[in-house]
Each structure stands twice: as C-alpha cells, then as structure tokens.
Amino acid sequence: MLRVHRLYSTRGAAEVLHAAPKYALRCGLEIHTQLNTRNKLFSLSTNDPFQAAATPNYHTSFFDISLPGTQPRLNYEAVLYAIKLSLALDCRVNLKSQFDRKHYFYGDQPLGYQITQHYNPIAKDGKLCLYGAYDNIPEDEKTIGIIQLQLEQDTGRSLYKDTDGMTLIDLNRSNVPLVEMVTQPDFTDVKQVRAFVKKYQNLVRHLNISTGDLETGAMRVDVNMSVNGHARVELKNLPNTSSITNAIRYEYQRQVDIIRSGQADKMLKDVETRGWTGSATIKLRSKESTIDYRYMPDPEIPVLLLEPEVVHRVATALPELPDQTLRKLMAEPYNLSLKDAKILTTNSNSHGNFYTHHDLRNYFMKTFQLFTAKTGASNSKLPANWIIHELLGIINKLEIPLPKILQLLPASHFAEFLALIHDNELSKSSAKLLLFHIINDFKESHCSNLALPDFRLLIEQYNLNPLNEVEEHALTELCQYVLRELNDDALVADLVSGKKKNALKFLLGKGMRLSQGKVDPALLEGAFKSVLGIKW
C-alpha cells in the first residue's frame, strides 16, 4: 500500500507543478560536499570515511574524538579545493575569512560544537547556469544564484540497527572536510532542481575534489521551499536524486492542498523542518523548537588570510568546465550529438574503475585528429561511433580498464583501424568481430601481451577482406536462402506492404551473418528489395 501511495502522491504533485500557476513554488538548496583531501580538516588523520566503515573509529586522532587539550590544525589542501570550487561557480573568493563554532549537543559531535564559517565564509555571490538545450529544463536558460560557500567539518555517524537499543558512534567521518553551498531560492520547477543537483555533482567530480556520491553521503542535499510566499519548509533525509524530486513534489502538493482548504494562515505560518520517508514528508521540528546555535568565532583558529596570488594560481590551473567542453564537442569539427557529448563530459561513477570521462574524451579527441589527418574525412562519425559505443561496450563487457586498452590500442593505432573501415578495406561487421577478438585475447593474456596488433595481417589471417564486387546472382541466391530459412510469409507480406519496414533490418542481419560480414550492407539491402519487389 505504501508503494501505491507514493506513486499516487508524487505523480499528482508533478501534475500540479505544471498545471497550477496560481501556486508559485520557490525553492533553494543547501548542499554539503565531502572533499577528498588526503587528511581531515583540522587533524592529520587519514580522510577515508567510507572504505574504513568496516573498522569503526579507525581513522581518528585525539582531536577527532575531542580529547581535552587537543587543538585544530587547518588543512590547507581543503582550502585550495574550496577555492577551486568557488571559482568554478563564479563566486567572489574572500581574501579574509574565519571559522566559527556552531554549538549543539549530539552523540556524533563530541566537541559539543561544529567548526564552520557562519559569519565570514570563504566565498560568496556565485552562480550556476542551466540551459534548456543541455540540462532538460523548460526554460532556454536559468541562472541559479549562490549565496555562499563555507568550509566546515563533518560529524561522526550514529548507528542504530542491531544494537539492542544502544546507539553506536563511528567517528571515522568526524572532522572530514566539507564545503556547504547555499543557493538563492531561485528554483521554480522541480526539473530545475534535478538539473542543478546533477550538474553540481558532475562539476565536483570533474574538478576531482569529491566523489559526489549521494548514496554514500559524500554529497548531501537539503531543500528549502515555500508556496505563494508562506513560511519556509526545510526537507531533510534525501539520499538520492529521485528522493529530492519526489519529496519536493509531495511537499508542494501538501502545501497546495492546505492553501486550497483555507488553512494556510494556521498551518503554514511557521518555519518547519520535515523529513522524507520515501512516500511522504513528516514533521521533525517547527520554529518553536529551533535550536539556538550560539555562533561565536573560534578562538583556536587564526583568521584565514589569502594572498591574491594564491587565488590567481588556482584560477589559472582550473580545467575547462563541462559546459565549455560540451559546446566544443557539439561544434565543428566533432559535431557530436548531445547524448554522445555528455558521455564524454559526464562522470556518473557508474562505470566503476574502467574509465574516466577525462581519459575517454582525450582518447576520442586525439584519435579523431589522427583519423582526420590520415583520411581527410573531417566530418566522419566513425571515431565517435567506434569509441563511444563499440569500444566502451567491449570495455564494460570484458571489464578491462581503459588505461590498459590505451597500451594495446593507442590513439594512433586505433585511428589506423578506423581508416581501414573508412577505406572499405574492412566491413563494419567484420571490424566488430576483429576488435572484440583482439581485446579478448589481450584479456586472456592477463593484459601482458602489449604487442600492437597488425590489422592487415589479421584481416588476411581470418579472411576478413570485404567482397566489394559480388555477382548479382550470388546476392540473389543469398537473399532467397534467407527467405526460405525464415519461412514466414506473413512477415514478408507485411514487409512488402510497408507495415513492418523494420523487418528488412532483421533480414539484413541474417544475410550479413551468413556472409560473415563481407558483403556491403547497401548492396545486400538492394538485393532484398529487388527479390521481394519492394517499392517503398
């Protein structure tokens, strides 16, 4: 029943978001991002909160567990990572910032306060632009303002399951460096929120400052939203993108229903924090129970002063940002589709350790340049099709890391392979078989045989030379054989009439397999049409 209720609630809310302009959504985000520095923010403990999960409290120092007399020592690598992200988000980096104490009591915060940057954060006044063409939002362009970025320490983890009623505390995560980013309430549509989260996630991965994983807590998103200017509601416990969007949809519908019932002045007058159960939002606390954090400057940490030269050097070393790369790949000379360009610019972490988008993109661009120089085919789709689709398919199937493939098939060698296809010295179907054979043999040698394959020798060895000149009667006999073996008059009739035009591809596939990929597909298609008398 819960499953049915969740689907009904979120779908209904989605419809209202698009169909109820009288009920204006305003939404802002707070995103906490763990930085993958070598050490923690204020100690020399190893920053490894997840891989050490099997050994609680393993990566901890005296400061992490708050032994009396220990003092914080700022990790400047975290400062540089924060500057890097600030510049990528077009923020104004403050040359003078400070750390403050945010006081509250909880078991996973042994200090009794969190060290953060409340009054003078490291950066302010940034933005991230979303585009209809790239980010799947209704508008052509939407700019989301960023209020500030601040450095702060993470808390430990409280564990409740299978503990006989006890709460266990793991401090491996305590004092891990975080950047908290706070946006302006500029979101007016749930699609904008989804696009922003995905874009920000890809950005921190692209900058190599965080894994950006929502499921592990390396990136955590809180939502602040209101409808028609009523009191703000904060949404927490949002472990993934679908939870974020579904919670917003559900809460939007809940508030719209309250407004329609005339109860808004009573039920939406106070700031409220609500959690997401997976099917509904539930009240956690209201304004009356809001915590007074008693912020104060941390007397043990000096004011952070940055030289302008430091910011300039970080800006100079900043890599090309994903949107810039996307535009480049979709323009001359590459002319990639949006889907293919995103494969080369989006680091989804779903491919494990097989490849990174950075390495894959560099391999594609280098291969493209060498292939173009070799063949003069400036607008060819061959490099994109064979690297993004065929080669990646083999990498994922055989589970071979791209760096190993680059040793076997460097860009210059793969460009030569593509040139053989371009010059009709190797058919596409034979090329697929040959490429898989080469890489599979490489895997079976435990990736130790690094001799560059001789493509022409292999083509001769396996008799893969294409049949460029085939007598018409031979093609006719091949088509007739395929049709006899198929023995499906109804399908053939639908094909000839045009009801099932895709059936021709089915016949072509059978014919190509019988010819071992040696026949030109265009010639074979013409032969089938001639044999069947197809007029369309």
Swiss-Prot record:
Its EC number is 6.3.5.-. SUPFAM superfamilies: GatB/YqeY motif (SSF89095), Glutamine synthetase/guanido kinase (SSF55931). GO terms for cellular component: glutamyl-tRNA(Gln) amidotransferase complex; mitochondrion. Its main location: mitochondrion. PROSITE patterns: GATB (PS01234). Keywords: ATP-binding, Ligase, Mitochondrion, Nucleotide-binding, Protein biosynthesis, Transit peptide. Residues 1-8 form a transit peptide. This is Glutamyl-tRNA(Gln) amidotransferase subunit B, mitochondrial.
